[in-house]
Amino acid sequence: RDPNGYWCNWTGSSYVNPLAGVIGTVYDIKEAPNGDIYICGIFDNVSNKGEIVANTKGIARWSKANQQWEAVGDPDGVNTSIAVIYVMAFDANGDLYVGGYFTDLADIANADYFAKFTVSTGLWSAVGSGIDYSVQAIAISPEGTVYIGGTFTSAGGNTDCKYIAYFDKTANDWRPLSTGLNSFVYALKFAPDGRLLIGGHFTNAVGTGGDFICWWDGSAFGSFENLGATGLSDYVRSIDINKNGTIIIGGIFTNAGGDSNANKIAAWRG
């Protein structure tokens, strides 16, 4: 954190204020294919050298070319009184998807809790026919299918889309993964073998297994208990995979696989 806000650069030896302040909380940072940096969170605006940048509520872009903060979606940004954006993801075309707690983003009907920003046109759009509550996680498959997780219990009017769903481009609407899960999803990550790893507050994703973490193989949920593992003591907030294929999770748990040293962070090397 820099002295003027909640954003700074690490040069390798020190933190540097990038001529800006972000008064609030930054939840996610993503780099666009062109090198621009996008940040999102819960903040009213950002500033360049002390000058407030209009229409940067909840999301802003650091322009690599102009070396300054800019609104996302000229000229009005997200243009909503409530803008809490938790998560972002770029697709293969360089377009941006955002999830959070907001309704009618940029005054667009059905742009509720999830929306798309087409970088080439600078326009926001709805994705499908709407979601009923907040989106906390986004993952895009190698084939370009968008998956979301969160606290919602319906997407596109489908009540089987409980806490997790994917977007069917052909039907132009949301579809369920089986009949969904029984509680919140906070993390989604595709593994190298194509499985979608899912972390959250749910239990019993697979019979009596799959508490707090499971996977989706394209047709069914699976669990690490199926591989002989002991489960977690509490929920998962984040999932990542290192270059060696090791799955790393973080969360509220104090025990993973029976190991009390796996306290809030653990690795799976199976």
Predicted regions and their residues:
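Extracytoplasmic surface signature
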Residues: R1-G270
